[in-house]
Each structure stands twice: as structure tokens, then as C-alpha cells.
Regions:
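Nucleotidyltransferase catalytic core that binds NTPs
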Residues: 2-4, 14, 21-25, 29-35, ...
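Intrinsic disorder
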Residues: 8, 45-48, 52
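N-terminal leader/targeting signatures
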Residues: 38-39
Length: 279
């Protein structure tokens, strides 16, 4: 889930999704899947049976582009909770302008990034709902309610967010309901000092919700928080985009397959890959 002081990451603005992702009859399952066929080796999330009591851990965001910092957070959460992490690309979050790459491109880059990564799954709930409900604004609480309807009331569900997003959590749509409907796993950066930046209203609402261990989140459907304190990397999507646009050194910020994709597509004003010399 991306940083920001308003509802972030999981939602879409006015259901907006580029036409390239709607090419086959407006059907998300048909239009996205063929385009992902070249990204072999990635795993796609399927909604588990309601009988399953395993914690469902959702990491939403624009992933524009997905970078090594995103992957470090996802891996750390996977290892801390010993469950898969479902990475959910958003179509167009309500709090920010349209992303630099369209939904299909970001979905393809995410699939490339997690190819061969055990326990990291692609989840297309947001993209599919944006196509099914064009023109309808969607927020994180909408996604959680949709997932809750599919999973059932008793399955533990958690959202993985950054500490900077938590600081503005009380500006999210129906944030108090969201606190009860799902757990929050907060990825912290060393020395960020986010605890001191929490608004008083939010700090009061979070008091008493912090879990003693990550395992505690599996014992309740929602309502708890856990701080994922790891030596996380400092990459950001805005840093990657700025370096690409400025002709700086950027390739080390993203997985190699994603760097190749960005070059080939000319995303973020990247220079296309040079053609191979004639033999």
C-alpha cells in the first residue's frame, strides 16, 4: 500500500482503468491473463475456502513501478507470519494522480518481479472490480468488505501498510470500521519516528490494539496491529521514476526483469533498449 495522508493503495478513483486492460470485451479475467502469459513462474492468488483459518495478508499499492523495497517488505512479512503475501495492484488510488504506467503494465511488472518467489502471490481484485464497476469510486474499506464477503466473517485478514501511511490513517474512508474489519501490519523504517507523529485521535484509537506477537493476528478476524520492524530498504517508486526520467542510475532499484520491461516499453521516459547489432 502506498504512502499518503489520504486513503491509499487498495482503492481506485472513479473505477478508472486504462483501455489496454479492457481489450477483450471488458472482461478482466480474459484481458489481463493472456498479457501475463509471458511472465511464467509467478503465482496468482486465489480466494481460499472460508473453512481455511490461515491469516490472509494483503499488500496493496500502485507498484509504479514495483521495486526492491516493495519486495523486501513483502518477504519480511511472509517470513514473520509464515503465510503467503498477496500483492494487490490498484487501478488508480483516490488520493493521487494517474500512475505513470497503466494498470496492465504495472500488473505485468509485478508478475515479473515475483516470478519464482515462494509465498508472494499476485491478486487482481482491484483491477477486476474497476472493470466490473466503471465510474464507481473505490476505497480500501470497499476492498476489505469485498474480501470479507468472500472469506467469511471469521477468517483472519490483515493489510500490510507502511508506517508513513499509518500516520495519516485517520483520513482514510471509514477508518474506524477498517480497523475492526482487518488487522494492520505496519512496516517500519529504522529511525522513522512515526509513533511521535500519530494524531491524538488516531493514537487513542490504536491504544490497546498492538499485538504481543505476529501469531496473535491469526487468532482473531481483525482489530489488531503488529509492527514489522526490519532493516528495510530505502527505495521508493517516486525515486525510481525520477531517476529514470532524469537519466540517472536507476536499474539497481528494481528487479532485473522489471528493468528490462521498463526499457522495452519506454516507461517513465526510459530510453528503449538498443537493438542487437546485425550479425
Amino acid at each position: 500500500m502506498t504512502a499518503g495522508t489520504r486513503d491509499s493503495g487498495l482503492g481506485t478513483r472513479n473505477g478508472k482503468i486504462p483501455a489496454s486492460a479492457c481489450a477483450v470485451g471488458g472482461n478482466a479475467e480474459q484481458s489481463l491473463q493472456p498479457a501475463l502469459s509471458s511472465t511464467s513462474g509467478f503465482s496468482e492468488s486465489r480466494v481460499p475456502s472460508p473453512e481455511s483459518r490461515e491469516l490472509q495478508l494483503i499488500y496493496g499499492g500502485t507498484f509504479d513501478p514495483i521495486h526492491n523495497g516493495h519486495l523486501a517488505i513483502a518477504r519480511a512479512a511472509r517470513d514473520a507470519f509464515a503465510v503467503p503475501v498477496r500483492l494487490m495492484p490498484a487501478a488508480d488510488p483516490p488520493h493521487r494522480d494517474a500512475p505513470g504506467a497503466d494498470a496492465l503494465q504495472r500488473c505485468e511488472m509485478l508478475a515479473l518481479a515475483i516470478a519464482g518467489e515462494p509465498g508472494l502471490l499476485l491478486d487482481r481484485h482491484e483491477l477486476q472490480r474497476a472493470l466490473a464497476q466503471p465510474g464507481v469510486a473505490s476505497y480500501s474499506i470497499d476492498t476489505v468488505r469485498e474480501l470479507r464477503a468472500e472469506l467469511g466473517a471469521d477468517v483472519p485478514l490483515a493489510l500490510l501498510i507502511g508506517a508513513d501511511s499509518l500516520v495519516g490513517f485517520n483520513a482514510w474512508r471509514d477508518w474506524r470500521s477498517l480497523l475492526d474489519a482487518a488487522h494492520l501490519v505496519v512496516a517500519d523504517r529504522a529511525g522513522s519516528g512515526w509513533e511521535r507523529a500519530l494524531p491524538a485521535e488516531l493514537a487513542q484509537a490504536l491504544a490497546g490494539r498492538w499485538a504481543a506477537s505476529p501469531q496473535a493476528l491469526a487468532g482473531a478476524p481483525g482489530g489488531l496491529l503488529w509492527c514489522l520492524r526490519q532493516p528495510l530498504r530505502s527505495e521508493s517508486a517516486s525515486q525510481a521514476r525520477a531517476r529514470i526520467a532524469g537519466g540517472g542510475d536507476w536499474a539497481a532499484l528494481v528487479p532485473a526483469a522489471v528493468a528490462d520491461y521498463i526499457r522495452a516499453a519506454g516507461l517513465y521516459a526510459a530510453a528503449p533498449a538498443a537493438p542487437a547489432p546485425a550479425s
